[in-house]
Amino acid sequence: MTGTANPFGKILLYIDGSESSITAALFAIALSKAHGSMLRVIYVVNDNLLTELLGAKVFVQMEKMDYERDLEEDGKRKLNYIVKLAEKKGVKVQTILRKGIVHEEVSREVVSSDCDLLIQGELGEVLSLRDSFYEEGERILRKVSCPVLIVRNKQKVDRLYESV
């Protein structure tokens, strides 16, 4: 942009591997390309959930460790997929893989990277008030200290991604 600072200089994209987070990734890539923004992508292995499952005796310790390793590998694959999508459009991406409580890790990254915008996929369907307190996308939305863009409409985003 001529004569003005880029309002989206640092974009953080949160992905969880859902179809809506892939749609959000396509949008984040297109926006980053259009504005020359730095794009960082974060995936968080929810080890809090794993600990709860261990405590509820759904897992034994060895199963928890195996499942956690599987989730880390899955996170790496998803991050690498986003990198490939970005490379197709000439956008450089920095990936971040964390373990912890999802909304806290995303919020921590927003602060540490001083991001201008957080992008995430469409929120999951909330069937009860209780669900709204536990849906990670909702918790992220409430916790972070920067503007948040929720991406919807896969067909429109696909066209936008293809056009850049």
Put a short name on every predicted segment.
Residues 44-74, 159-164:
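Acidic, proline/glycine-rich short linear motifs
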Residues 56-60, 112-114, 136-137:
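Short, hinge-like loop/turn segments at secondary-structure boundaries
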Residues 146-158:
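Short, flexible loop segments at boundaries between secondary-structure elements
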Residues 3-61, 143:
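Small/aliphatic-rich secondary-structure junction motif
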Residues 24, 51-54, 107-108, 130-131, ...:
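Short, well-ordered secondary-structure micro-motifs
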